[in-house]
């Protein structure tokens, strides 16, 4: 009898544990900032592993401060075009608490303000956060990470951004769109895939060689990968009046950065690197860096360095075109290695510095005397088209018929990569030999999804 009773109690306890471990779904039923049915109340009530979904549309306007996520939860929105959470420029939107694992999908986060702190839209506070199909926009602060601050300093933090847009955010110091922080021996990982980082800015005062870095993204000692994405129309620094500032309008990297199948375009700074400023480890493959500029002035003299890239870089199967600097190289100012890459019409010069040629490059000028490897072509027009939709998720420069880049790449190349910048179905080797640059000339596959169109933004509210 005692054994039977003991067994029965054990079964009941087991069932209770199983029931407790089962995830619950809590549905947000109104757009109030607090009270029953609100998102804030749902986040108060959840347990680890629960799901928060929504039966509402419109805007949740925050009036009681940031939304704290202090459980490991899934927040599943109805779509970024359907529901927004607005900080009203009075508070941050989301704060993901330390040690938690969270995911947010299908929401727009807007109007976040961190004040003098970091992360206007989101603070990922030593947590693991995945964002999918979201928009983070019109947020900022006087510190770091206007849109998102991924804090792994003296600890760890991991941020994954998928199929999302980070746009029109501002930070006074660095990381207008995103700041990835691995300072003080920390570990911060940032992964961006199939996403757009555009129209963000970082600006500070006119301190010589300081202030306003990483208009789009700033990576401070962390591990960062960007794949199938666009970083465009970001800005960094100020023109003066005493001394221009700013570095890495698109990206400023002080860690390890790998860029693959992506486009860095039309970013502008006033001192170092319109496109990418590197003071760490930088690898760019199957990508396009185009139309970026560094245009500072000092005492009436040009002062912009490296329109496309400044620093050490390993650059392969890529295209650098039409970048501008008013003082030094429009393309690359720095060192590293370059192979199977097009350098076209970067004003000033395509390269300033000492680069090791891996061979099979084409330069519209003499390449600064660096391109002496096998198959290198200098003072040669690569014959490329404008930056446009040529298929795939990002904009590219197509090779025109008759281009000297066609079938002129490394004859010993074998995949991977299996596809050019546009990804499947655009193979990396067509007609027996790889082309030079990020684009492989081949018939257009009309079924390939076009680059995501940017929704027409609403008028930008005046910050309070």
Task: Give names to the regions the model predicted.
Residues 19-21, 291, 311, 438:
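Intrinsic disorder/low-complexity segments, especially N-terminal tails and targeting/processing regions
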Residues 21-118, 124-127, 132, 137, ...:
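N-terminal, post-signal-peptide segments of secreted/periplasmic proteins
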Residues 119, 145, 175-176, 273:
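The feature encodes a structural signal of leucine-rich repeats
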Residues 445-463:
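Ser/Thr/Gly/Pro-rich low-complexity, disordered linker/stalk segments of secreted
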């Amino acid at each position: 009898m005692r054994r039977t009773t003991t067994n029965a109690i054990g079964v009941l306890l087991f069932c209770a544990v199983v029931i407790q471990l089962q995830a619950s779904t809590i549905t947000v039923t109104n757009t109030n900032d607090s009270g029953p049915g609100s998102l804030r109340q749902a986040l108060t009530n959840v347990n680890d592993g629960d799901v928060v979904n929504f039966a509402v549309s419109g805007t949740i306007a925050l009036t009681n401060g940031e939304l704290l996520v202090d459980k490991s939860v899934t927040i599943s929105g109805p779509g970024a075009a359907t529901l927004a959470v607005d900080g009203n420029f009075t508070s941050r939107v989301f704060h993901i608490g330390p040690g938690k694992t969270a995911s947010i999908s299908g929401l727009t986060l807007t109007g976040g303000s961190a004040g003098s702190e970091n992360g206007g839209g989101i603070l990922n506070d030593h947590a693991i956060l995945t964002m999918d199909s979201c928009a983070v926009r019109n947020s900022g602060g006087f510190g770091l990470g206007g849109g998102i601050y991924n804090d792994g300093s003296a600890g760890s933090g991991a941020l994954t951004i998928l199929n999302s847009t980070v746009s029109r955010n501002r930070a006074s110091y660095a990381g207008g769109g995103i700041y990835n922080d691995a300072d003080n021996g920390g570990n911060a990982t940032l992964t961006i895939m199939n996403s757009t980082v555009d129209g963000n800015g970082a600006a500070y005062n006119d301190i010589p060689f300081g202030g306003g870095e990483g208009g789009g993204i700033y990576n401070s000692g962390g591990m960062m990968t960007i794949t199938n994405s666009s970083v465009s129309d970001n800005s960094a620094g100020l023109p003066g009046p005493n001394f221009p500032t700013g570095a890495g309008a698109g990206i400023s990297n002080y860690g390890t950065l790998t860029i693959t199948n992506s486009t860095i375009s039309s970013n502008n700074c006033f001192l170092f690197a319109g496109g990418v400023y590197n003071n760490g480890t930088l690898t760019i493959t199957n990508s396009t860096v185009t139309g970026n500029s560094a245009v500072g002035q000092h005492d009436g003299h040009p002062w912009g360095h490296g329109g496309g890239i400044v620093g050490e870089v390993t650059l392969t199967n890529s295209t650098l075109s039409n970048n501008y600097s008013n003082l030094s190289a429009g393309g690359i100012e720095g060192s590293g290695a370059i192979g199977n890459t097009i350098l076209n019409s970067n004003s000033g010069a395509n390269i300033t510095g000492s680069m090791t040629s891996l061979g099979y490059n084409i330069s519209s000028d003499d390449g600064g005397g660096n391109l002496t490897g096998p198959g290198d072509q200098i003072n040669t027009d690569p014959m490329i088209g404008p930056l446009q939709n040529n298929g795939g998720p990002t904009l590219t420069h197509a090779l025109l018929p008759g281009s000297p880049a066609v079938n002129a790449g490394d004859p010993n190349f074998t995949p991977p990569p299996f596809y050019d910048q546009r990804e499947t179905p655009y193979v990396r080797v067509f007609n027996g030999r790889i082309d030079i640059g990020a684009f492989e000339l081949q018939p257009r596959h009309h079924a390939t999804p076009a680059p995501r169109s940017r929704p027409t933004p609403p008028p930008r509210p005046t910050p309070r």
